[in-house]
Every structure is written in structure tokens, then in C-alpha cells.
Amino acid sequence: MKRILAFVLVVVFVFALSGCGAKEAKKDIFNLVEKNYDAIVTACENKDSEALLAINGIKEVDIVDGYVLIYCKGAGIAPSSQDYGFYYSEENLPVGVFDGQIVCSNSELVDYENGYRYLDSGYNEFYTEHIKGNIYFYSTAF
């Protein structure tokens, strides 16, 4: 029993030090966008997923209906997982994003903290916040 407790405490400690939290992920993504803003905007305007994937910190790119959806990181195992990234909106409108798809429109979002939130009927939460220009941060909890 003591070994199991010690193992659990070590795992919790390692995750605490690794910056796996939502605030750290958000800060990292805001910094990534700020540092690479011109390259990101140019690549998004040209729908150049290869140029985006060449930027350190970008893992996946999906282009859907005037949006370039960019996945950066995730944590956890469903049903307690979170994904983080950002997206470029041609019309500069926020939306809900999940798994490379748009899950809700601008009109379905409600004001929340510094951005907007959408809760679906399955208790999944989608949050988005303006970063700069036509670029928005997103997080998804599912």
C-alpha cells in the first residue's frame, strides 16, 4: 500500500512540475502565436499546412470552411482530457473547435472569462479566446 501511495505521489509531483495545466498550455500557445505571428498569418492566408507544421509546437493542422484549425497539445485520457490549440478565422469570428472540426458557431457561444464558451449536451466544454488579429486560442475538455 505504501508503494502505491508513493508511486501516486511521484506521478502527481512530476505532472505538477511538467506544466500540464490549462493556464500553462494557454500561456505557451499565446507565446507561440506572438513569436511566430507573421509566419502563422501568411501560412493561414495561403492555407499552407506544411509551413504551419514546420513551426515548433504545432502538431496538426486542419482546414475547414474558412478556418485553419491548429492543434498544439493535449493532456489526460477520456473522459477527463483536454486539447489545446489555436485557429485562424477568415471572417474573424470565434467558434468551438474539437478534433479538427468546428462543433459550434459563433452564435452558440456565450461570454465566459476572457472569451467564449460552449457546453454541449454530453458535458463537453469548448472555450475560445481572441489572441491577436484573426487568431483565437481554443481549449476543449471532454
Predicted regions and their residues:
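Serine/threonine-rich low-complexity intrinsically disordered regions
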Residues: 1-2, 20, 36, 48, ...
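Sec-dependent bacterial lipoprotein signal peptides
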Residues: 1-18
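Short, flexible coil/linker segments at or flanking structured domains
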Residues: 3-8, 28, 119, 123-126
